[in-house]
Amino acid sequence: MLLLLHRKHDAQTDAYGLYLATCSSDKKVKVFDISDNKKPLLIKTLEGHEGPVWQVAWAHPTFGTILATCSYDKTVIVWKKGPTPDDWTNIFTYKEHTSSVNSINWAPHEFGLILAAGSSDMTASVHTCITETRWESVKIEAHNVGCNAVSWAPALQNRRFVTGGCDNLVKIWKLDEEAHKWINEHTLEGHTDWVRDVAWAPCLGQGRNIIASCGQDCRVIIWTQERDQWRRKELSRFRDVVWLVSWAITGNVLAVSGGDNNVSLWTERENGEWDTFSEVNNVPMPQPLPPTSLVRSSHQLAAAKQLDAD
């Protein structure tokens, strides 16, 4: 199940469910051992940011145990675990953004160790690991006022990712392999206020591209690509700002959370309409900027509840 974690800005488990990383406004990132399904054991506190830490993101285990973090302090940091649980090293720091870095997302591992980030300085950045000590970074002029969210497309196609911004737009970016530059392939209009989150759906067995976006305008929009065009379908209007959208790994269930402290699950019916089939009400949730994140597994939620109880 896709559920919500309160109090922390973000919490993510690694691919094997061995570690849980959390971050918050105390500038710290905490890594817990959750491998025994008992009380989470704090094994490392990562300190390096100088402001609230908004998001954490685990890289694919192909590359080792690697965690990326982003912060209000305008930086992105990539950490790697050594041979012992408490041995963590900062292997990359990016300081070229001029405002808060709000969102990070790793590319599919088939493309290599590549991280995208979105910032309030109106840009997105893409960071490619050549070696652990050498990274190549590029900035893209993405959204007027600021970029709130980034999400990569599945690896079944060329390198693409989607961004959402304070200009009310959703933009799709494609790598021009010959020119070695990112180009704005599509700009999707439909929101009437800031886009708070975007999520490109996994395409297991679907054979089509689907993106979910949500915003300050209380809307959730499902974008489906048909040939070179994107078709828009809006879910039923929500009562409050919608902070987050998150797909199940199968790509056919969407979790939505917002300012009304509710989390709802949606799926597409055979007639193409989207319906909600489950809802959790009155989930305590602060509203930082960026907003809190969805926990992506019940294992993660159980660990988080134990942390909050301490």
Model regions and ranges:
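Beta-strand initiation motifs
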Residues: M1, N37-L42, T84-N90, T131-E136, ...
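WD40/WD-repeat beta-propeller blade N-cap
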Residues: L2-K8, L46-V53, Y94-V101, I140-C147, ...
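Beta-strand-rich domains and repeat architectures in extracellular enzymes and scaffolds
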Residues: L3-K27
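WD40/WD-repeat beta-propeller blade-loop signature
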Residues: R7, Y16, L42, P52, ...
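Loop/turn segments within WD40 beta-propeller blades
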Residues: A11-G17, A57-G64, N105-G112, S151-N158, ...
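Conserved strand-to-loop turn within each blade of WD40 beta-propeller repeats
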Residues: C23-D26, T69-D73, A117-D121, T163-D167, ...
